[in-house]
Amino acid sequence: MLSTPPNLLSSRPPSAGRIAVLGGGITGLTTAWRLQRAGLAPVVFEQSGQPGGAIGAITRDGWRHELGPNSLLEGSAEVAALIADVGLGGRRIYAAPAAKQRYIVRDGRMIAMPGSPWAFLGTPLFSWRAKLALLGEPWRRPSPADAEESVADFVVRRLGREFLDYAINPLVGGVYAGDPTLLSVRQAFPKLHALEQAHGSLIRGAWAQRKIRGGPKERIFSFPDGLEELPFALARPLGAAVRLGHRVLGVARGEDGWRVEFERGGVRGGETFAAVVVALPAGVIAALPVENIPGAGRLAALSEIEHPPVVSVFTGYTRAQVRHPLDGFGVLVPQVERRQILGTLFSSTLFPGRAPAGHVALTTFVGGTRDPQLAGLDDPALLRVVQGELASLLGASGAPVFTHVQRWPRAIPQYTLGYQRFKDVVTAVEASAPGFFIGGNCRDGISLANCMEAGRRLADAAAKYVTREGV
């Protein structure tokens, strides 16, 4: 059980290897776990009452609503190794085979995304004009490597308007809850940008990667008790070093190290550390008082990073209430369809334990950059919107037998055009303050895998600093 040390008012001199980690989400926990494995002494300050950040679940009467991320992608050896090292290798449950199929709405009906070249030729999702135009993609000139281009412009230039409207736009809505006309392709989808730069073509690049791809397959997985098993597994060996319910008030650099001031339950305290790792949301970093660092005030610019509101609406039905077979990962809704949802996950198809026997669970997302005003509706109004959309798309009849609404007022950082300036601010502040490190989804990518990889980067940098400086 994670606990909080009683000596809140202690003011201790820095001891060798003590590193403050601000934020107990996946980035912070991965950082601390790796630092401990390296023989150092991390202390995690987390304001909420449990580790994991956006990861969490509501479990009631046989239903499980994943409040934030719903799954992990086993797409890198690093992620697979970390899962095994924290003791969860044997607890992975992989998405059902049916989850390979994904639906897109076109002209009011759900159409399966083609999963092969032959299926692509026959799909009604794209017109023959769009399919034929795609044949010219390998011969289209790439943009300059340093060009700042939106995701929308990139896709239209390489693949055509229809692929933007009925493939990339719904994908961006599902991943970022964002707008492809606003996002930077280099920042939001760096792999797409890299494919074009390396191979001159997305199609040629995809074929080349298929030939050389090794390591684990990109399989989707979770755990029997949901994704929150991961942060708890990371936090468990850290024990009392995870300080829950601690709000960080400020950080200051001094002659004897880094002073972290904090508050818990109205009681203030402070401790000194050899180094500080900041793994907090962008808006929290922007508002964090940081003293005695040249140019630290520039971090206030991070408050300008857009985070649209998103609401996750969980609805449970009896199997007989839903006409659609729910034989897929879920359905994404293109903006051109003018509907009121971003998409719906078929949660009980993905993994077992999400709904009682004889029932189905659906997780629907509302809001984002596309419709931020809808995220402001009250719960009854939101449920009416979602029920109406599910009735139209999936043939869901009657009221759901279970519901839960989870609101994220500032959901996902938007890697918009010009986003590099925010990263440059962070880099400049770090350069002016040895022993002060910043990472997380506002800098390293928004996926859980990105955050886990950021934790490794931050731990390596902090450990190298402490070891080199002998502090």
What are these regions (language model features)?
Residues L2, P14, A38, A240, ...:
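Mid-domain catalytic core of redox enzymes
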Residues L2-L9, P14, P114-W118, P325-G328, ...:
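Conserved flavin/dinucleotide-binding core of flavoenzymes
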Residues P14, A133-V251, G257, T272:
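Active-site/ligand-binding neighborhood in enzyme catalytic cores
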Residues T27, Q50, G283:
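Conserved Rossmann-like nucleotide-cofactor binding loop
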Residues Q36-R60:
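Glycine-rich FAD pyrophosphate-binding loop
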Residues G75, R157-R158, A279-L280:
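Short, well-ordered coil/turn residues at beta-beta hairpins
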